[in-house]
Amino acid sequence: YNGDRIKIQNAEEVISGDDEPTTAIRQKKDSSLRVGLDMLHKGQGDVMVSAGNTGALITGATLIVKRIKGVRRVALAPLMPAETGCFLLVDGGANVESSAAFLKQFAIMGSIYMEKIMHIKNPRVGLVNIGSEEEKGTEDVTEANRLLKEIPINYTGYIEGREIPCGAVDVVVCDGFTGNVILKFMEGMGIVIKRMLKGIFFKNLKTKIAALMVKGGINELGKTLDYTEYGGAPLLGCTKPVVKAHGSSNAKAFYHAIRQSIDMVNNNLVDTISENINKYLSLIHISEPTRHA
C-alpha cells in the first residue's frame, strides 16, 4: 500500500467494553474513540469507522459530532441478509425505547439510506409488530403506524418477525431493544445454518460427493450469511458519517465498512437526510408520551 495515504494518530487511553459510555467519553479524552470523534468534528476527516464500545461510540457521536438539526435520536442501521438480498434494520440497538416520533424518523432515514446508498428505488418500509391488525401493538407502535401513513415514503404497514428474513421489505423499523434481538438472533441463525450444512454434507462419502456437486450454491449461501460482506452499521442522524463495525471484524469487514462510509459521503447521505427530516416534520402532527422527552 501507499504509506503516504495513511496517517497514524497516537492515542494513549483505551475505552473497554465494560466502561460506562458517558463517563468514558468525557474522561478518556486520549482514547482512540474520543480522538477519532474529535478529529471528525474538527473536519480532520470525512467519516469515522470504529469497532469499539458501541455505547461509547453512540454517546460520543451524539455529544461531539452532534445530531442533524431536527433529528431526535440517532439510530444504528445494520444491513442484514434476506432471501431476496438484504434489508436495513433501524434501530439495531441505539435506543432501548423509541417513541412514535423516533420510529417515524428512523423510517425516513432508513428509506433515504437504501435509496441513496443501496440504489433501491422507492424502498419498501415496514414497522415491526406482533400482528398485522391495525389495533395490535404498543401505543408507540400504533401511533407510529399512523404517522408513517402521512409521509411520502413507501410505507407498507406492519411486518411480523417471520416475514423479516423473507425480504418482504427493504427497511425494517423498530425500537432498539427489538432490533438488537433481531440482529443477534439472525447472526446466531447464520452460524447454526452453516454448522447444520457442514454436518449434513460431511457425514459420509456420498454426502461429500453431493457437496462437491452443489459447492457453488453452498459458497453463495455462506457469503450471503457472512456479516463481513455487509460492512458496518451506520449511525444514522449524525452530522457526519459514523459507522459501527462489528466487534469481531476482520480485514474484509473493515474494508466493506470503509467503502460503505465513503459511499455515504459521495452520495451526500447526511445532506439528504437533513433536507427530508425537516421537510417531513412540517407535514404531520406528533403526539408523544412525556416519558420519552
Residue ranges and their predicted role:
Residues 3-45:
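Phosphate/nucleotide-donor binding subsite
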Residues 284-293:
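Single conserved hydrophobic/aromatic residue that forms the stacking wall/gate
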